[in-house]
Amino acid sequence: GAIAAGLTALMILIFLGSWRSTLVVMISIPLAILSSLVVLYFLGETLNTMTLGGLALAVGILVDDSTVTIENTHRLWAEEGMPLSEATLHGAAEIAVPTLVSTLAISCVFTSVVFLDGPAKYLFTPLGLAVVFAMLASYALSRTLTPITIGLLLKSEPRHTDGQTPTGLFSRMSAAFERGFERLRDGYSKFLTVLLRRRFIVPVVAVLMLSLGAVMLVLDGRDFFPLIDGGQIQLHVRAPAGTRIETTEAIFQAVEDKIREVIPEQDRTLIVDNIGLPARAYNLAFADGSTIGINDGVIQVALKDGHKPTADYVRKLRQVLPAAFPEDVFYFQAADIVTQILNFGLPAQIDVRTMGYDKNNLAVAKELRQRLAAIPGIVDAHLQQEVDAPAFYAQIDRTRAAQLGLNASTVATNINVSLSSSEQVSPNFWTDPTSGIPYYLAVQTPEYKVNSLNALGNTPVSTSLAVSGQTVPGMLSNVATFKRDTVATNSNQTNIQPVFDVYASVQGRDLGSVAADINKVTTELQKQLKPGSSIQVVGQIQSMNDSFRNLGIGLLFAAVFVYLLMVVNYQTFGDPFVVILALPATLCGIVTMLFITGTTLNVPSLMGAIMAVGVASANSILLVTFAREQQLKGHSAFEAALSAGHTRIRPVLMTAAAMIVGMIPMAIGGAGEEQNAALARAVIGGLLFATPTTLLIVPYLFAMLRKGNDGKPHHGVFEEIQQ
């Protein structure tokens, strides 16, 4: 944020050529941010990554209102010779309504975040609120504090028209920039004149631009969220069903050794293993939900600062580990908190569920796993449920048990107490008289003693003898026989229906393309299911589709709000179309920049698109407003459009350059900054296309739509209705 503010200040200094004017603009940034934080505090929001990201994103745009105000004042004072006090009042009043409309337009487009749901809503609503409140505070400051500071700081500054010879390095550089800018402005005016006279050029360019945007949109691909490099790796290892805990531990040690070969010591901090389920009473809602037994576990790897990309190590481990341990199953889980939230509790990006009571669903789920694993871009495809774990079934002789005063429930309870401790079925406590701390008292057969089938048969079973009234411990082998079989170690249900989950992740391909291939597979396999069974795709695919749909609806409503806002401001239904018709060029720039930088279309980049559209609308509104004023003074639509472009080129370029340069550090990104990088790249791409569109296509559209009103005062639509 500080780097962005510094670069923004540098661009303003270059364009205005005055450190005093730059100071006037930069004063509004911290005050607007603090005002936004105050409002967020009263709304119950916290200072977190998303609110800070929103404020960092807003740094470039916060200077917009103050920049336009001081540029307009500076033009009236330095170029037209108006006294400073009069220029301050007239300059602020002249753009008060247009800047209000442009600020509200930016705020309107950010209202689309309210249509989000799920994790995306809780992530991006604070970001949107931070930007909106900062923008509103910036407008209030530009109406109050900025004119005051202009009067205080600029009164001792010499005018550009005073004819003084520049002294000092900065003054000479500023004068040289002004000469270069005037040549640019003259060249722009000549080029705009050509566009306005040769009307076929703009439609041809527009068609080419839209075609480019359509191609880039197809090539960009879609994701729910960019991959975050948190410097952590979480590897899930599953040994064959029935593997003993000590064997599992040896496997994990061998896997650790292989990880150390792949990840050098200078890049890793530590490696931690978590094998099996918790031994004592523990709420498994707080544990890793994908761990199902003693043959299962997680290896967590923490990397040092400055490490090589985590994704490269993960890609290498996906190649090395299955080759070294072909009997074991490996899959990587989300290690960073953002991706864990986006997965919404699932251990993978994609969860394809086979639901229903039919026994054939297991075979369909296994075929589904094989089909998914063959899809390009799918990695770590595995069936979560383990259905072939070895087990002993105790077949109780009910007649013999009844003779001993037992029933099946009593025998089962005794087995449970012996193998899993009495803590589960009959918890007892002992309170330390000194400290008052209660402790569990539990009875359990030591695991090392249950080392054979005979030892299992010697499990004590309490036998109630009605004759003597005494309780005599008997042996389990007296009332039961044992049979080897297989059993499912875990069972899942959704809406009471049994579920088989096939989990998978994506690597080297966008989620949207993978989702399209998954839908083809599920459509084919759905035909093999009996009535009452179904296949459901959840996880990030579902979240992505919902978020894209809701954001699209939100953007549609935002466009309607912005249009109606301009209708009220311009008092006509026609002029707002000049602004609306220029927005597709902004979207074309966004998708083009995303393609060039290798960034997919995702929720953060859509948030950047929202901001770029808002800024483009704001600049177009100011230009159209100035052109309308010129036409009301009696100029033709051609002359008004040319004059508006010639006059507003400086604030448009200054605002766009300040935002683009301020976004560059965020766009470069780094480890853990991928979400902000996608957002910033979308803003930069949108503004790179929106700026020439505002300066060239908007005047062209204005001249075309208003050419019938040449030399005539234009009445508002509501005035026309009244007449």
Placement of each model-derived feature along the sequence:
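Signature of alpha-helical transmembrane segments and their immediate interfacial
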Residues: I95, P166-P226, D273, A324, ...
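Transmembrane alpha-helices and their membrane-interface boundaries in multi-pass membrane transporters
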Residues: M11, V59-T73, A96-F115, Y122-S174, ...
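Extracytoplasmic/periplasmic membrane-proximal domains and adjacent transmembrane bundles
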Residues: G1-I3, L13, I70, S85-A87, ...
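Interfacial helix-loop-helix hairpins and adjacent transmembrane helices
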Residues: E79, S85-L89, P119, T125, ...
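Hydrophobic transmembrane alpha-helices and their membrane-interface caps
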Residues: G6-R75, F115, F133, F561-R648, ...
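Helix-loop junctions and hydrophobic alpha-helical segments within the transmembrane domains
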Residues: I70, L76-V101, F124, F548, ...
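Transmembrane helices with small-residue packing motifs
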Residues: Y41, E45, V113-L123, P203, ...
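Solvent-exposed, membrane-proximal periplasmic/extracellular interface segments of envelope transport
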Residues: E246-F344, T399-V425, T434-S435, Y448-K449
